[in-house]
Every structure is written in C-alpha cells, then in structure tokens.
C-alpha cells in the first residue's frame, strides 16, 4: 500500500510568511556598502555632505592626482559627485574653482545648491589656522569666494560648517579661546545678508572634550 506524503499545514504557512520577506536582491537599507573607486581613492576620503535633494555628494579628499609640479605637497581638496537617474553616483571630480594650493574641506551646500560653505586653512586671507569661506554658483561656475569675516572666524581653528534647513543659521566647530572644551560648536545667524557675531551653543551641547561636525 502506497503511503501518502504531505507537508504539515503549519509548515506551509511558515514558508508563506518567510516568502513575504524575500522582496528583491537589492541590499536592504542599513547595510554598509563601499561606494567604490568612482568615489573613493587610495588616499583619505572623508567629511561627506549631501545636498538637500540628496543628488550631490561633497567630500574632502587627500588623494594624489597626477601632477607635474615639482615639490607639490599632498593636501586636502574638495570633490563632488552627482547621482544620476539610475541611482548611480558619477565619478567624483575636483572642485577646481574652489581648490587651491591650501587645504580646503568640510563643505556644505545651501538648500538651492547655489551657495557653498567650506573651510580653508593656512591661507593669506585666513584670520586663524582655518577659516570658513563661501562661494556662489553662477553659470555653472563657483565664483565670488570670500572669507565669512571676523564676526564668524577667530584667530584659531574654525571648520566643519553645517547650514540649517532654513538657510539662516550656520553651525560650525571651533577651538577658539573662551569655549567649554577642546573644541566647541558655535553658530552664527544671517541677518539681511550679513553674518552676526558667532556664539557658543553652551554647556548643554558642548563638553570639556571635542565637539565637531555639527
């Protein structure tokens, strides 16, 4: 007599539930993926910042580009990559209008993408070790590069700018005298096109240690 073979009904229901979890082969959110050599290099790449629409990626890099300049030292430069319609990031390229023989890094964009805030270090127009600068995008070219001034910058290190969504408040890190720790978070407010005297965010935010990258 032939013995009937069957799968217990509870196993069948369990298989159905597991099958619901199998959606696609696209890695789920939360999985860390290396962005590959279109973004990364053999040098240090860090300080990423996205545009408000998440379609532009700014970052700082110490990569060594091919150069025929004698005794050219490796420094920090700003790079940018754009997200295409297929969800692929373009090959990052140097922001030539911004980069100089000095160190540039830690950038952020305004909501409309037309104003760039970044830090530049050890330059003749710097008040301190590193200062905050701005640049304007006109006809697809970054121009009107200027120091944000003594109201914002100090005689020490000022870097890591981060703009509020409203675009009127700029947060940044500084190790200037008078802080609560080694480096603190400060802010400045734009009123009628001018940045006000920067202020410390206070002991609720800052500690006796380092606060950076707001």
Can you name each region flagged by the protein language model?
Residues 2-214:
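Short, conserved micro-motifs composed of acidic
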């Amino acid at each position: 007599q032939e013995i009937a073979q069957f799968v217990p009904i509870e196993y069948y229901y369990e298989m159905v539930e597991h099958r619901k979890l199998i959606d696609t082969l696209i890695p789920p959110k939360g999985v860390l993926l290396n962005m590959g050599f279109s973004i990364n290099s053999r040098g240090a790449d860090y300080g990423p910042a996205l545009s408000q629409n998440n379609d532009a990626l700014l970052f700082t890099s110490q990569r060594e580009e091919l150069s025929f300049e004698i005794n050219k030292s490796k420094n920090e430069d700003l790079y940018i990559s754009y997200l295409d319609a297929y969800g692929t990031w373009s090959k990052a390229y140097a922001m030539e209008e911004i980069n100089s023989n000095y160190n540039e890094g830690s950038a952020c964009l305004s909501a409309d993408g037309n104003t760039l805030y970044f830090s530049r270090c050890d330059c003749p127009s710097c008040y301190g070790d590193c200062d905050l600068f701005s640049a304007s995008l006109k006809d697809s070219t970054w121009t009107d590069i200027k120091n944000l001034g003594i109201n914002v910058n100090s005689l020490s290190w000022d870097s890591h700018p981060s703009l509020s969504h409203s675009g009127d408040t700029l947060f940044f890190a500084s190790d200037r005298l008078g802080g609560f720790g080694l480096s603190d978070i400060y802010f400045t407010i734009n009123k009628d096109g001018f940045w006000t005297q920067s202020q410390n965010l206070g002991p609720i935010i800052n500690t006796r240690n380092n606060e950076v990258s707001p």
